[in-house]
A protein has these predicted regions:
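The feature marks helicase ATPase cores and/or their adjacent C-terminal helical subdomains
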Residues: 1-646
Length: 646
């Protein structure tokens, strides 16, 4: 068996339910009705609150449990003395509470009510069976199907994964698309698919280096197979024998580029802001399959553009495109360097090299149009694996109807508790798949509803609704002496600095620190416009109140001192950017599950996807502001702020 399937030295089970423990926190008289195994488990949990680090090892906790049950059955102890009397004497609700907190970060797991009642963890004489973990495993292991791949590798798959592998083996020369929900093991499945295809002739593509590393681990130790989207495009564009262009140590800022290109501005926007708007236009162009810049790529404006304004913007964007062609080192200043590389490769007519027979794309919901064009020019078989719910801002990749499609709904990362949270979201989305999500019964992800002013535990990932939400949580957590980090530290610090400067434009002036204003504020001429755009965002209103109370660059610098990338820091990340990743502990912010009416059905659909992404990231524990089912029901009864005609 592969190590990712099961580690017999991993999880240890305690024979008591979470509900029983929570009941004891309210009323200790519940001890009277508990069995000896349950009482022993309660004592073990209490001991965790004061145990030393080495005793927190699951195996050590299991030994304590076994000794308690052995003492209960075999003694020696005085008449009338047993686990019941000792549990009542030693019971401490405070220790039990903190012991339960320790379990959240350990490899100890509480059993469900049915398994506690079955008592299969006991030997015939009533003592603890140390083989319980290994005996329990076959009954709950989702990886029950053995497969021997083309390289004589043993793979253990779920039933759904095994069915898909059989389809591929029976039809190796047919295109295939797999729509798989979060946690189905797409990267592992992709590794199994590659094993069944011709060695050295499969091109595996992943969107990010992190996803590529995960894929390589599944393929095999030391594997260098596969490329990121950017690496693939760069390889197509590189000319043999020509040295790679050296990156300039210092690149010109946006203001300098605007002056170089004679971008004077339009409407009330100056040259720098106009360049930011041109970058939005170019990003839309790079995501499309179009060959030339057109009005279809113009970003949305609250006040519609005149024909002259549109022509001016297209001319400026054309100049910027030419500049980027001549100065590729400036790509990294745009915020979308990978899209630029793919667009250049597509426009140049490149295709997948003929030495490859198959192309496999992981996380294909984020697959841009130019990459699809490059692949379609070749004659390779294309296999895509994606999850449409992990694309919050649109439908994502759509394969042709004639392409064989398969759905996988069984998640090996998410358990029944997460299943009950996600299915209401799937049911309420207006367009996407309605196939019911199914979590593995052997997985126990803890669910906790947190109060206001809650401080997450160390190492928790806080998934937010917007940059304002991230800024709010960073300020709140710093006030509580927590160390925080961001998925994009530089970008988030630039956002906060730009917000402070724009709020106090009379004191600082936009870009007064010599750096470019964050692209989020490309359309903002003044703070009043930012207010208008975000007046329904509670996190923005909270941040604005802090700015009004005197939060300035000096306070921002003090806040920055608490930024850290250490493992025990709290990572803040927009939920829609967390797709394809997984974390032990995840918190969803109140603004992510906002109660204010949404702008329209499209905005609500996007938020449903963002909440889906957030819920499905957790391996061990989820912290929620309130119940997901109630949140969905609440918004079903709400009207949107805007309604669209037909």
């Amino acid at each position: 068996m592969q190590p990712e399937h099961y580690d017999f030295a991993d999880t240890v089970f305690l024979p008591v339910t979470l509900e029983v423990c929570q009941g004891l926190l309210e009323d200790a008289s519940g001890l009277e009705g508990l069995s000896d195994p349950e009482l022993a488990a309660v004592l073990v949990i209490q001991n965790l609150s004061q145990a030393r680090e080495q005793v927190l090892d699951p195996a050590a906790a299991e030994k304590v449990l076994a000794r308690l049950l052995q003492w209960s059955v075999r003694g020696p102890h005085a008449p009338g003395v047993g686990l019941g009397s000792e549990a009542r004497r030693l019971f401490d609700a405070r220790k039990l509470y903190f012991g339960l907190e320790v379990i959240k970060g350990s490899r100890l797991q509480l059993l469900g009510a049915e398994e506690v009642a079955q008592r299969e963890y006991l030997l015939a004489d009533g003592t603890w069976d140390m083989r319980f973990r290994s005996l329990r495993h076959p009954r709950h292991n989702p990886f029950s199907q053995q497969a021997i791949t083309g390289f004589n590798k043993e793979r253990w798959l779920t039933r759904e994964q095994d069915k898909l592998l059989r389809v591929l083996r029976a039809n190796p020369d047919e295109d295939l698309h797999v729509q798989g929900y979060a946690g189905i093991g797409k990267s592992y499945l992709l590794g199994a698919l590659i094993d069944c295809l011709p060695r050295g002739r499969v091109l595996a593509l992943a969107r990010t280096p992190g996803k590529l590393d995960a894929l390589r681990r599944r393929i095999g130790k030391g594997s260098k197979a596969g490329k990121t989207f950017a690496e693939f495009a760069q390889a197509l564009l590189s000319v043999p024998g020509r040295p790679a262009a050296r990156a300039s140590a210092r690149l010109p800022g946006k203001r300098a580029v605007a002056e170089t290109l004679n971008i004077l501005g339009f409407r009330q926007y100056d040259g720098e802001k106009t360049l930011d708007i041109c970058l939005e236009l170019l990003k839309n162009y790079c995501e499309s399959r179009d060959h030339s810049l057109t009005v279809r790529h113009l970003p949305h404006f609250a006040q519609a553009l005149s024909r002259l304004d549109s022509q001016v913007l297209l001319e400026y964007a054309s100049r910027l495109w030419t500049y980027l062609q001549d100065n590729p080192a400036w790509d990294r200043q745009t915020g979308f360097p990978t899209l630029l590389l793919l667009k250049r490769a597509s426009l140049a007519g490149h295709s997948v090299p003929s030495r490859y027979s198959h192309v496999i794309v992981d996380e294909s919901q984020d697959m841009p149009g130019p990459l699809m064009q490059i692949i379609e020019r070749g004659r390779q078989v294309l296999i895509t694996l994606g999850d449409e719910y992990q694309r919050a801002d649109g439908p994502g990749l759509r394969r042709a109807r004639q392409v064989r499609q398969r759905d996988i709904a069984f998640s090996v990362r998410c358990g029944p508790k997460v299943e009950r949270l996600i299915n209401p979201l799937i049911g309420v989305h207006s367009q996407k798949s309605k196939l019911a999500f199914e979590g593995a019964g052997s997985v126990d992800v803890g669910i906790e509803h947190y109060p206001l002013d809650f401080v997450p535990p160390q190492g928790c990932v806080v998934l937010t609704a917007s940059p304002w939400d991230s800024m709010k949580w960073a300020m709140q957590l710093a006030d509580n002496q927590c160390r925080v980090g961001f998925s994009d530290n530089f970008g988030m610090q630039r956002f906060m600095s730009s917000a402070v400067q724009l709020f106090r434009a009379d004191l600082y002036g936009a870009g007064s620190d010599g750096q470019d204003t964050h692209a989020y504020f490309a359309h903002a001429l003044n703070w009043r416009q930012v207010q208008e755009d975000n007046r329904f965002d509670e996190s923005f209103l909270w941040v604005e109140a802090r700015l009004q109370d005197g939060f300035r660059i000096a306070e921002l610098n003090a806040l920055s001192a608490r930024f850290s990338n250490e493992p025990d820091s709290l990572l803040l990340m927009p939920a829609q950017e967390a797709g394809g990743q997984e974390f032990d502990h995840v918190l969803l912010t109140q603004e992510l599950m906002a109660l204010n009416p949404f702008k329209d059905a499209y905005a609500f659909d996007n938020r449903v996807c963002a909440v889906y992404i957030a819920l499905s990231r957790a391996r061990r524990h989820l912290y929620l502001p309130y119940d997901v089912d109630e949140w969905v029901a609440y918004h079903k009864g709400q009207k949107f702020r805007e309604s669209h005609g037909y």
